[in-house]
Amino acid sequence: MSADADITVETEVQPLDLSQRSNDVTISKDGDDWKYTEAAITKTATAATSFNGTIKNTLADGKRMLIDNTAQGVLIFESAKINSTSTAAPALTIENGANVSFSGSLEVKTGNADQYAIRNNGILTITGASTMITSTNTNGSSDKGMDVSAGSVQIHLSKGMYLVKIGEKTYKIVIR
């Protein structure tokens, strides 16, 4: 006796849960698929894992995120936090060649007086009716929150959005 069977397995691509990551995270795009790798940014990355473009929760303290030059499209942040308080590098870097839109809630902090919380070397667009991006340097002697490198597109803000400076070190993008 024999039987033929077709088996189809569908898997749902999940959000990237930063609370489950214990190392630096690199975000990339392969065709239509968002990918991430978890490894020290300065070392060879491990195999990429797919995620659905949503990033949530808090990355381990002292770890960083890189959005590489293949990244093109919308990233949705669900109460995401990057707290790289002790690292001598930006907590979040957007590489030259990346063209990304941020939506949702993202808080990025650094505690190193010589570093920015966010360094934008690419194109960054802020979208969404309830989006809030916070970029803070928690070191009392620093005024560095966000850096926009020469040659990059600063920040595109949708209608009704504006950048607010709070104190000397914190910047928030507010949508009205």
Where does each model-flagged region fall?
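Short, surface-exposed beta-strand/turn "edge" patches of beta-sheet domains
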Residues: 1-4
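A composition-driven surface/loop motif
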Residues: 7-176
